[in-house]
Amino acid sequence: MSDCYTELEKAVIVLVENFYKYVSKYSLVKNKISKSSFREMLQKELNHMLSDTGNRKAADKLIQNLDANHDGRISFDEYWTLIGGITGPIAKLIHEQEQQSSS
């Protein structure tokens, strides 16, 4: 990855690459991840951030609710929405911890 990318651009590239890593590794359907493979990806890739039971339950609920077309597979758009939904509560927690440490 080029050093000319900003930290945010690098993060986006990692998210995109991670999706396609699991598509090619686990999915028979092109450009989609099964729900079970997505859960496995979360366990491997976000294990520390989802160690809180509440975060894990919230992630499971999002997975159940987001499969818009009910095909049991997660498209890239669904994945992107899921990642946003999962990171929202984590971002809030990080912000609260930063507030506490600065006071």
Swiss-Prot record:
Gene: S100A16
UniProt-listed Pfam families: S_100
Cystine crosslinks: none
Domain remark from Swiss-Prot or TrEMBL: S100A16 proteins, but not other S100 proteins, have only one functional Ca(2+) binding site per monomer. Upon Ca(2+) binding, undergoes conformational changes leading to the exposure of hydrophobic patches which could be implicated in the Ca(2+) -dependent nuclear export. Binds Zn(2+). Ca(2+) and Zn(2+) do not bind to the same site. Does not bind Cu(2+).
Gene Ontology biological process: response to calcium ion
InterPro entries: EF-hand-dom_pair, EF_Hand_1_Ca_BS, EF_hand_dom, S100/CaBP7/8-like_CS, S100_Ca-bd_sub
Species of origin: Homo sapiens
Location, primary (coarse class): nucleus
Summary of the tissues where the protein is detected: Ubiquitous. Highly expressed in esophagus, adipose tissues and colon. Expressed at lower level in lung, brain, pancreas and skeletal muscle. Expression is up-regulated in tumors of bladder, lung, thyroid gland, pancreas and ovary. Expressed in astrocytes.
Protein's name according to its UniProt entry: Protein S100-A16
UniProt function note: Calcium-binding protein. Binds one calcium ion per monomer. Can promote differentiation of adipocytes (in vitro). Overexpression in preadipocytes increases their proliferation, enhances adipogenesis and reduces insulin-stimulated glucose uptake.
Compartments where found: Nucleus, Nucleolus; Cytoplasm
SUPFAM superfamilies cross-referenced by the UniProt entry: EF-hand
Quaternary data: Homodimer. Interacts with TP53.
Residues at which Ca(2+) binds: D67, N69, D71, R73, E78
Stored SMART domains: S_100
Keyword Disulfide bond: no
One Gene Ontology MF term: RNA binding
GO CC entries: cytosol; extracellular exosome; extracellular space; nucleolus; nucleus; perinuclear region of cytoplasm; plasma membrane
PANTHER family, sorted: PROTEIN S100-A16, S100 CALCIUM-BINDING PROTEIN
Domain EF-hand: 12-47, 54-89
Keywords linked to the UniProt accession: Calcium, Cytoplasm, Metal-binding, Nucleus, Repeat, Zinc
